[in-house]
């Protein structure tokens, strides 16, 4: 069974440490999809992943004195329905910041 172009869906998963950069990238992707007559749903926010690192402050003793650092990974999903070849070309030519990780599934 082959799916026609009207039934296809592109799922774009975005990850970044900076929420503002992630939202700007989502806006660019949605604007690109809208200009090529494809319907975009999203951005759908996913839960933020927190990774906490615990480090001893002193190099020798004083195990009671510790310092905590954390990284937060913000994630979003955008679904693009009924994409055309023009939509895919426009998405490939899109210039996004280097701090945003993009994963595309067809």
From Swiss-Prot:
One of its GO terms (molecular function) is structural constituent of ribosome. The lineage of its organism: Bacteria, Bacillati, Cyanobacteriota, Cyanophyceae, Synechococcales. It comes from the Bacteria. Involved in the binding of tRNA to the ribosomes. InterPro entries: Ribosomal_uS10 (IPR001848), Ribosomal_uS10_dom (IPR027486), Ribosomal_uS10_dom_sf (IPR036838). Pfam families: Ribosomal_S10 (PF00338). This is Small ribosomal subunit protein uS10. It comes from Prochlorococcus marinus subsp. pastoris (strain CCMP1986 / NIES-2087 / MED4). Keywords: Ribonucleoprotein, Ribosomal protein. Part of the 30S ribosomal subunit.
């Amino acid at each position: 069974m082959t799916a026609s172009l009207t039934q296809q869906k592109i799922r774009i998963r975005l990850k970044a440490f900076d929420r503002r950069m992630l939202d700007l990238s989502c806006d660019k992707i949605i604007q690109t999809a809208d200009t090529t007559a494809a319907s975009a749903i999203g951005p759908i926010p996913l839960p933020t992943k927190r990774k906490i690192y615990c480090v001893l402050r002193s190099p020798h003793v004083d195990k009671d004195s510790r310092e905590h650092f954390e990284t937060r990974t913000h994630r979003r999903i955008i679904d693009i329905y009924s994409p055309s070849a023009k939509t895919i070309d426009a998405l490939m030519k899109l210039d996004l910041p280097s701090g945003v990780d993009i994963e595309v599934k067809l």
